[in-house]
Amino acid sequence: MPAPAEVQAATLQRFLAAWQKWDAQEWLDGFADDFTQITLPLSLGIPSRSRAEVEQVLPALVATVKSYQLTIRTVVHDPERNKAAVYALSTGTLPWGPWELEYSVFITFSEAGDQVAVLEEMMDSAFLQEFGPKFGQYLQANGGPRAVAAGVGAGGATAVH
């Protein structure tokens, strides 16, 4: 039996607000302990991430993308299936160029409906294929995800070209 629609709706609003604020901790606070992130399309070969893995990468991503702006185009909430879908566009600035990403997220709520249990993200694969390696190089050049998230690194932000 799905969680009450109003509980799911409140969780969805908290998720969207954290995303809009580009606040990693607020986002993480809404994830279930057994949370899983799945990057789509699966043909990209990106393995799913546990909550612990997302806790390492998300703060670094948020710290790396500056002047982040999110435009939410469509939200569909299906309380009977304990799910929601969001289509969004985002822009920002990376140390090596612009961040312009179009994506859809598919949310599965926890059994109680008060947390996000699964987040499937369908991202612009052309952007992601370029961004992924550069982000990895940037993290490595600047002391890893924790150092980037904390704003410290090898003498400040090192751009990747």
Curated annotation (Swiss-Prot):
Protein known as: Monooxygenase AgnL5
Signal peptide, first to last residue: none
InterPro entries: Fungal_Meroterpenoid_Isomerase, NTF2-like_dom_sf
Stated family: Belongs to the avfA family.
Sample GO molecular function, one term: monooxygenase activity
Keywords from the UniProt entry: Monooxygenase, Oxidoreductase
Pathway the protein contributes to: Secondary metabolite biosynthesis
EC identifiers of the protein: 1.-.-.-
SUPFAM superfamilies linked to this entry: NTF2-like
